């Protein structure tokens, strides 16, 4: 069966996001097949930084200024520095149409992104960001052109042939993702110790959450890789598609070596030929204590783990063990 090429690879059963702020999130995904932490981490990082869409200023027109090499009376920064500061304005904008926004201010004081008069669905995400500083009696008026796009677009590509004199193109940093780092650690799944754990830190400008950014990047990869699949998957037999109605809790089909018990407890269960949780819960405490090298400490450990699953020792399980237990375990593995 060709499906085994991908179906029998382990997939993460833990994908957790924690956010320390509006702009920063950490992803932990485990377990992954050996090497997949690096493969997925690198692919997601590159797509996150290059391919997500966002909004940015593409041009600015400053009253009384003809080109970016000018200076403005009463403004401490020259126009080149002002343009560099404009590049760092973080913007969220819905829709694909080009929009305008204006700022007008008199000195003394700083002109910040929060002073900009926005229209429609534009939101300034870093209102404290300083654009320029005015001296006493100075005045400035700027009009910004805002567009949606992806990646980085240099100012030259934002320069329209029919642009009016004084319209200064700006390098556009569209990507809402500012920084991505990741590392891969070893993790354990049952008794296997060499699976990968992917830990990724995502920093955005606030227009998208780290969790959504990863979801968008994964969807982009999914869409791009789909063109390389040159076959149709064989249809499963009808009896494989229908899930057999069980007479017991599907969690009993989980193997005891997936319970993350201590080595001593796990070895005792293995030596007593206890493979599934369904085998284990039918044992009484007295029977367990008669197992060689199995003491009260191991008993308490197992009771605590079972209790967390709503189970206990000494339970009766009808129709156990089922004839096709291995097939059932694979079929129900997503339910426990």
UniProtKB/Swiss-Prot annotation:
Catalytic activity: RNA(n) + a ribonucleoside 5'-triphosphate = RNA(n+1) + diphosphate
One Gene Ontology cellular component annotation held by this UniProt entry: DNA-directed RNA polymerase complex
This protein's UniProt keywords: DNA-directed RNA polymerase, Nucleotidyltransferase, Transcription, Transferase
Range of residues in the leader sequence: none
GO molecular function, one term: DNA-directed RNA polymerase activity
Entry EC no(s): 2.7.7.6
Pfam families (UniProt xref): RNA_pol_A_bac (PF01000), RNA_pol_A_CTD (PF03118), RNA_pol_L (PF01193)
Coiled coil: none
Enzyme class at the top of the EC tree: transferase
Family the UniProt entry places it in: Belongs to the RNA polymerase alpha chain family.
Domains as described in the record: The N-terminal domain is essential for RNAP assembly and basal transcription, whereas the C-terminal domain is involved in interaction with transcriptional regulators and with upstream promoter elements.
Function: DNA-dependent RNA polymerase catalyzes the transcription of DNA into RNA using the four ribonucleoside triphosphates as substrates.
Subunit structure, as described in the record: Homodimer. The RNAP catalytic core consists of 2 alpha, 1 beta, 1 beta' and 1 omega subunit. When a sigma factor is associated with the core the holoenzyme is formed, which can initiate transcription.
Name the UniProt record assigns to this protein: DNA-directed RNA polymerase subunit alpha
Organism annotation: Agrobacterium fabrum (strain C58 / ATCC 33970)
């Amino acid at each position: 069966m060709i499906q085994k090429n991908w179906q029998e690879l382990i997939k993460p059963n833990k994908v957790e996001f924690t956010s320390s702020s509006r702009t920063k999130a950490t992803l932990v995904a485990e377990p992954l097949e050996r090497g997949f932490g690096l493969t997925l981490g690198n692919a997601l990082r590159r797509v996150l930084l290059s391919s997500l869409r966002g909004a940015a200023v593409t041009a600015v027109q400053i009253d009384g200024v003809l080109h970016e090499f000018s200076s403005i009376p009463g403004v401490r920064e020259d126009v080149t520095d002002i343009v560099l500061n404009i590049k760092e304005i973080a913007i969220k904008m819905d829709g694909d149409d080009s929009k305008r926004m204006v700022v007008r201010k008199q000195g003394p004081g700083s002109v910040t992104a929060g002073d900009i008069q926005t229209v429609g669905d534009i939101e300034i995400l870093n209102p404290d960001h300083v654009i320029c500083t005015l001296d006493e009696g100075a005045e400035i008026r700027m009009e910004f052109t805002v567009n949606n796009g992806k990646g980085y677009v240099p100012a030259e590509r934002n320069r329209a042939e029919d642009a009016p004199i004084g319209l200064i193109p700006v390098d556009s940093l569209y990507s809402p993702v500012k920084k991505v780092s990741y590392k891969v650690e070893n993790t354990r799944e049952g008794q296997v110790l060499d699976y990968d754990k992917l830990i990724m830190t995502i920093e955005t400008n606030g227009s998208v959450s780290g969790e959504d950014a990863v979801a968008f990047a994964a969807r982009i990869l999914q869409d791009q890789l789909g063109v390389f699949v040159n076959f149709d998957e064989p249809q499963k037999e009808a009896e494989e598609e229908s899930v057999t109605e069980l007479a017991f809790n599907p969690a009993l089909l989980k193997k005891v070596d997936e319970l993350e018990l201590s080595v001593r407890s796990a070895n005792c269960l293995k030596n007593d030929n206890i493979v599934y949780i369904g085998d284990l819960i039918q044992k009484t405490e007295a029977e367990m204590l008669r197992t060689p090298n199995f003491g009260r400490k191991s008993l308490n450990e197992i009771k605590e783990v079972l209790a967390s699953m709503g189970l206990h020792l000494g339970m009766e399980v009808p129709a156990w063990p089922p004839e096709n237990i291995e097939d059932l375990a694979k079929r129900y593995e997503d339910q426990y």
